């Protein structure tokens, strides 16, 4: 059965239910990742040559990804589960409602003048230091997270579901989790996490650019395209650059700029064009992601119906 037919159902489940209230499968996967890391990691960083560290990391991600991807493929082929399994797995892979809820808490806190709460809660969704951010800094950090995670947590999962079905959604979500845990450029993970980071970059290459296209089509298209073309190449990430530059331009706000990470000030290129964002722009960013998500669902469903009619 065409995967596109399941996509609106899974998105409705996410909209109605959000993440599982008690236990998400990714929590268990994260524990497994830590166990595999303990077994696969050498005695200390730098104890082995670079190639061997990278090989260890590559073997670890293959060990973690292959069984779950194959299990999803097998379960989705069972006659009694061919609808339930794909819908359930895509529902678990997409985090649209969770992203919107986190952003809404920050938006509401800023709207009510509670800067301390806004700083605390934006710290849940970004890695930068948030304790000294002003209102504009909190709004900027939140919008950047919404735009980037809109690609990572929503559109990329939808893309791989449409391309490879349930196994694609599982493969992508688990690979993205591995990148979040191992894809750091520090002493411990620079080489061991190299394969996880590169694999995630590869999986996100096309989805990121389709996400950027979605943002500019649903916002200020000319501004979004200009920012994408001129600013994305300056950003530190080849996939986040197009997404955030196009999104900032589509919203007509200024993002990027310097930020403090783990006590160290990091200069970042500017993104977007327009005024400094406010709490109202957080809501606009969330709506941009949501409209894009349902646009993908509508286009996918229309394509599935058209293909079905042609082959009828």
Curated annotation (Swiss-Prot):
Pfam families: CobD_Cbib. The keyword Glycosyltransferase does not apply. One of its GO terms (cellular component) is plasma membrane. GO terms for molecular function: ABC-type vitamin B12 transporter activity; threonine-phosphate decarboxylase activity. It comes from the Bacteria. Belongs to the CobD/CbiB family. This is Cobalamin biosynthesis protein CobD. It comes from Chromobacterium violaceum (strain ATCC 12472 / DSM 30191 / JCM 1249 / CCUG 213 / NBRC 12614 / NCIMB 9131 / NCTC 9757 / MK). The lineage of its organism: Bacteria, Pseudomonadati, Pseudomonadota, Betaproteobacteria, Neisseriales.
């Amino acid at each position: 059965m065409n995967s596109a037919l399941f996509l609106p159902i899974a998105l409705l489940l996410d909209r109605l239910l959000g993440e599982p209230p008690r236990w998400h499968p990714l929590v268990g996967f994260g524990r497994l990742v830590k166990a595999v890391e303990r077994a696969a990691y050498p005695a200390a960083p730098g104890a082995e040559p670079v190639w061997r560290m990278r090989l260890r990391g590559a073997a670890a991600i293959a060990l973690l990804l292959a069984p779950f991807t194959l299990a999803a493929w097998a379960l989705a082929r069972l006659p009694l589960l061919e609808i339930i399994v794909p819908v359930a797995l895509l529902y678990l892979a997409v985090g649209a409602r969770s992203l919107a809820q986190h952003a809404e808490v920050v938006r509401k806190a800023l709207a009510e003048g509670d800067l301390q709460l806004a700083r605390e809660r934006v710290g849940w969704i970004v890695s930068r230091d948030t304790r000294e951010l002003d209102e504009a800094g909190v709004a900027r950090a939140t919008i950047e997270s919404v735009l980037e995670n809109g690609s990572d947590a929503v559109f990329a999962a939808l893309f791989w579901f449409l391309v490879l079905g349930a196994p694609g959604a599982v493969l992508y979500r688990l690979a993205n989790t591995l990148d979040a845990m191992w894809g750091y450029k520090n002493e411990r993970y620079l080489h061991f996490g190299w394969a996880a980071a590169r694999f995630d970059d590869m999986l996100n290459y096309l989805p990121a650019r389709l996400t950027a296209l979605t943002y500019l089509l649903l916002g200020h298209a000319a501004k979004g395209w200009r920012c994408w073309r001129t600013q994305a190449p300056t950003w530190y990430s080849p996939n986040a650059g197009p997404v955030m530059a196009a999104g900032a331009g589509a919203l007509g706000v200024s993002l990027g700029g310097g930020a403090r990470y783990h006590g160290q000030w990091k200069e970042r290129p500017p993104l977007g064009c327009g005024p400094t964002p406010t709490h109202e722009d957080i809501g606009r960013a969330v709506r941009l992601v949501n409209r894009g998500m349902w646009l993908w669902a509508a286009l996918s469903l229309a394509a599935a119906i058209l293909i079905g009619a042609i082959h009828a």
